Amino acid sequence: MKFWVISLLGFFLSLHLAHAETPKIIFDTDITGDVDDVLALAMLHNLADRGACELLGVTISKQNPLTAAFVDAQNTFHGRPDLPIGVTRDATAQKRDSRYLRRAESPNYKHDITSNDAVPEAVSLLRQLLAAQPDGSVSIISVGIAANMANLLRSPGDAHSPLAGPALIRQKVKLLSIMAGGFATIESNNHFLEANVINGIPAMQTVAQDWPVEVPVVWSGYEIGVSLPYPRQSIARDFDYLPHHLVKEAYLLYCGSEHDRPCWDQSSVLYAVFPEREYFGLSQAGRVSVAADGFTRFTLPKKDDRQPARDRFLTLTPAQRARALEAMVHLTAQPPHHD
């Protein structure tokens, strides 16, 4: 009897610990141009349906009048119509046209947000979400330009928290999983300039320089996503359980039916939610800096270096590549959960 009581206690304790360790995720995205943002958001909703993470909210870092409506349509499509959304109002953030955001205007996709004016400013929402969470519990996934992250770092105390941005991050955030830069030779180019960096160099420089050293940053470079092409066969066959599927339509509008789009943003999602499952390897700890032209440089600390090693970047073996891509396909194509 004693054995069974101990076993049951251990079982329930393990359940409690598993629940307590469920990652709390804020998704910061530049959803406008490339469609990998749409697939990454689908992954997060499906992971939340599985209980693998808790999705706290979505903030948008590029300017387009349809961003909030589209994200609300996708959140509603995935059964979370009230998920908080914030948009940048930084005039220096990149403006971008989109091939797929107008799907939010389709009657096939219900939602109630029709204007960016109806949602909070992104940094205000970030501060609100962070302040409401337990200390050291939030993982931020940033896939796009770093406007919102840089402005969070610059933010003063407010009604949500008296802490300025760096102190609030230090208190509440346990990981920044960021898709940006390049950390390998890419197509014989040793000085590759990646889009998320060069489309907002000052903001990415601010993040690389000023992000608190106590909070780890894991970078997914261009070379990771380009090694993980989302198979067009999945788009053709795995989304037909509904007559109208927002993710499939966005993919086809962006790149057509004959293209395997790299999983850049999805790689940062997969690592942030499952850092212990070894879908990826990690570099040694060091520091990332961003040059004036947008080149990301990773350096290992020297023995006399007073600057703590805060940054790592993802690596990928052939075996990990197969596992990671399979996971991404399943987690993207999973039918949405509806009550």
What are these regions (language model features)?
Residues 5-16:
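Bacterial N-terminal signal peptides
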